[in-house]
Amino acid sequence: MRVAVVSEFYPRAHDPVLGVWAHRQAMAARDAGADVRVVVLYRPIPPRATRPRDAPRALRTLAAQPRHATLDGIDIEYVPFLAPPRPLSYGTWGAWAAPTLALALRRGGFDLVHAHNAVPAADAVLRARIRAPLVVSVHGGDVYYTATRHASGRRAVHRAFGAARLVLANSAGIEAAARDLGATRTRVVRLGTDLPEHPVAQSRVPTLVTVGHLVARKRHADVLRALWVLRDRHPDVRYRIIGDGPERGPLEDLAAELGLGDRLELCGQLPLHDALARARQGHVFVMPSVDEAFGVAYVEAMAAGMPAVGAAGEPGPAEIIGAGEGMVLVPPADVEALAARLDQLLGDADLRRRLGDKARETVRRAFTWEACGRATVTAYEDALR
């Protein structure tokens, strides 16, 4: 079975962790028997938020992206396209990307196209008139943002979901949202992680860890405020954040305002291997984010025997906690409840160990890349019937 994977989010020369989950799923599908090639849609124009003095360097970096690469044995073609800037035009990006995508796929040689997200990838596939069965994976952006913020985006999402032979969601909550937007044939295919072969040595200092882009919805600020509530009960606890983004400055300012500047460790964006190594040295993984479709970072931490804390009512944490133990939930945006749960976990090493053991077992049973690969290939086979 020959599969063309089309994605906007995929590792690039200047950003090797962007969409790494899409690459790992492609690897998992290949290892489960599919013949996979990847086409990446990328817009070689700096984001509108780029500072003017940084724009020339950003433009050179984007322009230097090779058109072809091989990563972990998978052939990748990077297809540039021009489009107006986000956010209002995002729903139309499929139309802008379609001509160059059509050229990239004109040779054919595949039985099925797997598009990550309805917009722009699946919409571009449809507009390029690619004559192959279409599978669409929805990871949250289509249902949380694209379909709710622009009429053009909503139309594109409806069109893609309606045309797909199968829509794959990363959690049951996202599957339900996709069906509300016109998807008829759906199933949940969970993403995964690797289980460490050996125990990971923890930091000597009690450490909370979050891995995620520094954006407001990840609620890093809530963790800082909870740490302030616990400042006297747990004076040695540190908070390590792995990731980067627009909230870095505000988080540094908040930490200074709360008197926690010496407790906050901002690691920036790290290569995946280094990010996992640093994250798994922690004692508790905490990410009380909202609009969380899945959250691979939770299961990556749990695989190493770390208990995880997430927000109640979110599709991703609900999917994980529904599969087994090792994760606890708190009401979203409730700093006092978050502080109470962290106080419990930080103050009881036996509880952390028990929850950590259960977390690792939950991942072993339900969230490995091997399981994801098998489920993905089964979905491909069903879409071809």
Language-model features: locations:
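Aromatic "clamp/platform" in nucleotide-sugar-dependent glycosyltransferases that forms part
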Residues: 290
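Short hydrophobic beta-strand element within catalytic cores of glycosyltransferases
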Residues: 307-311
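Carbohydrate-associated surface elements
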Residues: 173, 192
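Conserved acidic donor-binding segment of nucleotide-sugar-dependent glycosyltransferases
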Residues: 322-323, 327-336, 344-349
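Conserved donor-binding/catalytic core segment of Leloir-type glycosyltransferases
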Residues: 168, 200-227, 240
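Nucleotide-activated donor-binding/catalytic signature segment of Leloir-type glycosyltransferases, i.e.
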Residues: 252-270
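Short alpha-helical donor nucleotide-sugar binding micro-motif in glycosyltransferases
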Residues: 161, 269-270, 277-282
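N-terminal subdomain of nucleotide-sugar transferases
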Residues: 1-64, 70
